[in-house]
């Protein structure tokens, strides 16, 4: 459950380390975002060689959340951190590598490129 002031780690190699959620896409009154949702974020922390400047507004897809998510078979999944992958307007990842596991829900949402780059799909 990601809402407007939430901070997220970045799970790709774009050079951005932390993001801050500034908008949840998908409706004018939508409050929370979960696995596979696209959000608008502000870049809050970067590494020195990053091509994206601090303060830049980017779109990101949520790949890991701390809050447990119920699956259709009745099982639950949760992670140790909130993490996202920066994407462009075509919903393709801007980085060339994905770090850490990603949820299987991304495949259902149509983010096949992120799923194929990830080292593990849970």
From Swiss-Prot:
GO BP annotations listed: translation
Entry keyword rRNA-binding: yes
GO terms, molecular function: large ribosomal subunit rRNA binding; structural constituent of ribosome
Taxonomic superkingdom: Bacteria
Gene3D superfamilies: Ribosomal protein L14
Cellular component terms per the entry's GO annotation: cytosolic large ribosomal subunit
Keywords: Ribonucleoprotein, Ribosomal protein, RNA-binding, rRNA-binding
Disulfide-bond pairs as recorded: none
Complexes and interactors: Part of the 50S ribosomal subunit. Forms a cluster with proteins L3 and L19. In the 70S ribosome, L14 and L19 interact and together make contacts with the 16S rRNA in bridges B5 and B8.
PANTHER family: 50S/60S RIBOSOMAL PROTEIN L14/L23 (PTHR11761), LARGE RIBOSOMAL SUBUNIT PROTEIN UL14M (PTHR11761:SF3)
Family membership noted in the UniProt record: Belongs to the universal ribosomal protein uL14 family.
Entry-linked HAMAP family: Ribosomal_uL14
Function of the molecule: Binds to 23S rRNA. Forms part of two intersubunit bridges in the 70S ribosome.
Protein name: Large ribosomal subunit protein uL14
Species for this entry: Brachyspira hyodysenteriae (strain ATCC 49526 / WA1)
The organism's taxonomic lineage, starting at the top: Bacteria, Pseudomonadati, Spirochaetota, Spirochaetia, Brachyspirales
Designated gene of the protein: rplN
């Amino acid at each position: 459950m990601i809402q407007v002031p939430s901070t997220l780690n970045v799970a790709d190699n774009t050079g951005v380390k932390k993001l801050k959620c500034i908008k949840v896409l998908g409706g004018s009154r939508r409050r929370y975002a979960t696995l596979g949702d696209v959000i608008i974020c502000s870049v809050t922390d970067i590494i020195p060689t990053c091509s994206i400047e601090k303060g830049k507004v980017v779109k990101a897809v949520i790949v890991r959340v701390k809050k447990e998510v119920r699956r259709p078979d009745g099982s639950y999944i949760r992670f140790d951190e909130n993490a996202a992958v920066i994407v462009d307007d075509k919903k393709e990842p801007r980085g060339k590598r994905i770090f850490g596991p990603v949820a299987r829900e991304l495949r259902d949402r149509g983010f096949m490129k992120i799923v194929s780059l990830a080292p593990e799909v849970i």
